[in-house]
Regions:
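Surface-exposed, low-hydrophobicity segments enriched in Gly/Pro/acidic/Ser residues
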Residues: 1-171
């Protein structure tokens, strides 16, 4: 699929992981069939809460760039393991973050990530206070290709975080 530069809508379309980015072309190589063993079965999409009062669906969120990635953007931070699909055990980030009490305390998380793990805010992680969970009507998900399209363009200072579950070949 080729998109002309003037047809692309910046800051609206996002792959859920590198796996989907890396496998997109092979998945759509034989239209109209989609050749993907993965189907997203559940997703939550969180965004910076700008101008909307907090509600029951708002919560504090920390999003990690390399969580669940087999191939990490910053291999010096997390050792890579061999597993083709995104998973919390694809690298040791989830285990380290889950075990660290200071990260699980939202108020001390940034300091701990920066000082202890040498992570960079805005690169390795983003902390979103009072993030708003998007309603299903605010985005479209392509469950086999692993990307979402927001109904509106994100502003440059907004942050998006996702949590999702999937099956591979139905299991």
């Amino acid at each position: 699929v080729y998109i002309k530069a003037d047809d692309y809508d910046d800051n609206r379309h996002f792959f859920l992981s590198q796996y989907f980015t890396n496998n997109y072309n092979s998945a759509v190589a034989s239209p109209p069939l989609i050749n993907s063993p993965v189907i997203i079965t559940k997703i939550e999409v969180w965004i910076t809460n700008v101008g909307i009062s907090a509600n029951a669906e708002a919560r504090n969120v920390i999003g990690f760039m390399d969580l669940g990635e087999t191939t990490t953007y910053d291999p010096t931070l997390i050792p890579n393991l061999i597993d083709p699909y995104p998973d919390n055990t694809s690298n040791d980030l989830y285990g380290k973050m889950n075990a660290d009490v200071d990260i699980r305390k939202y108020t001390s998380a940034s300091g701990q990530l920066i000082n202890t793990y040498k992570y960079s805010a805005g690169t390795n992680f983003n902390k979103i206070e009072n993030a708003r969970k998007l309603r299903d009507s605010e985005y479209i998900i392509h469950p086999q290709l692993g990307y979402i399209s927001l109904n509106r363009r994100m502003e440059d200072d907004e942050v998006l975080a996702v949590a999702y579950q999937y099956t591979v070949r139905g299991s």
